Amino acid sequence: EIPTEWKPILEFFDEVWCPSRFIQKAVASKTNKPVHYFPVSVDFPIPCGFDRGYFNLPQNTFLFLLVFDFKSHYSRKNPIACINAFAKAFPKGNEPVGLIIKSMDGDKYSKEFQALLYEAEEDSRIVSIDATYKPDEVLGLMQVCDAFVSLHRAEGFGHCIAQSMLLGKPAIVTNYSGNTDFTRPNNSC
């Protein structure tokens, strides 16, 4: 559901175009105007020149990646669920796996960022990177990791999920919201 305070803004438009059926349904519930689904194209040049050394990541380790921006509502992105799932899947602590949590703007959300760091510090295989990367660096990071994880509570579209899948990475994602337009049992879990 979209915020009620957005409803007056909808009056300025003749129609609304939405990047996912999830958003289309949410917007349509708040207006009588036409609301159309227009899928987003995901296309980019394949990044080159990046390796794990560029990001100071371990070699010979299967790396799961989560990418999010603190401005996109920390609780909605649900990074603690990723940490908990990682710990449950690999409880011994000696499996050759790692979880890379790439965030940005943690300094502007210190309470949430500190909670994330506290949870991440419990397992030395979890690496937290809070930095602003150029778009090709984010794609390069996706490329050098082995799988993408998003245990979100809601995604409008799921751009990072789509990008990682286009790079050929397995996606482990919540079966809810905007990403369900393109994440299916035959291409993700």
Locations of regions flagged by a protein language model:
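Short hydrophobic beta-strand element within catalytic cores of glycosyltransferases
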Residues: 170-173, 183
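Nucleotide-activated donor-binding/catalytic signature segment of Leloir-type glycosyltransferases, i.e.
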Residues: 110-139
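A short hydrophobic beta-strand element within the catalytic core of glycosyltransferases
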Residues: 148-149
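Donor nucleotide-sugar binding/catalytic pocket of nucleotide-sugar-dependent glycosyltransferases
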Residues: 14-25, 32-48
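Nucleotide-sugar donor-binding and catalytic loop/hinge architecture
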Residues: 48-64, 91-94
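Conserved donor-binding/catalytic core segment of Leloir-type glycosyltransferases
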Residues: 58-77, 83-86, 99-101
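Short alpha-helical donor nucleotide-sugar binding micro-motif in glycosyltransferases
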Residues: 10, 139-145
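Aromatic "clamp/platform" in nucleotide-sugar-dependent glycosyltransferases that forms part
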Residues: 153
